Design a protein with these regions (language model features):
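Beta-hairpin "wing" of winged helix-turn-helix
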Residues: 69-84
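Short, Lys/Arg-enriched N-terminal segment that forms or immediately precedes the first helix
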Residues: 2-18
Length: 105
């Protein structure tokens, strides 16, 4: 991906929130899209972010932000069937559509 393509991809995210979209939101989104589903621990290790940063970011990109505001609805969390205390993250239908549009750039 060249810089023009990167700019186009980032513009797709800017539409969601032109004034407030931390770069680690984009990083988390891209890792989840690439791996299909991941644990919080995997995201922490790959992106060198704290558990609280991952948790807040995933919530903001989910259905409801932690402060009760509507989220971006790009990610879904669900209990890991193999380990009930662990949560997995995957792209929502809206997130999959955005991921496909970025892949086509």
């Amino acid at each position: 991906m060249d810089l023009r393509q990167l700019g186009t991809a980032l513009a797709a995210f800017a539409v969601l929130s032109p004034t407030h979209l931390p770069i680690h939101f984009v990083q988390i989104f891209l890792v989840v899209g690439e791996k299909k589903q991941v644990t919080f621990q995997e995201l922490m290790g790959e992106l060198n972010l704290t558990n609280s940063a991952i948790s807040r970011s995933v919530m903001a990109m989910g259905e409801t932000h932690r402060k009760g505001k509507p989220g971006f609805e790009l990610l879904e969390t669900f209990k890991d069937p193999a380990e009930g205390r662990r949560f997995l993250v995957r792209l929502s239908p809206k997130g999959r559509a955005l991921y496909r549009s970025i892949q086509s750039i």
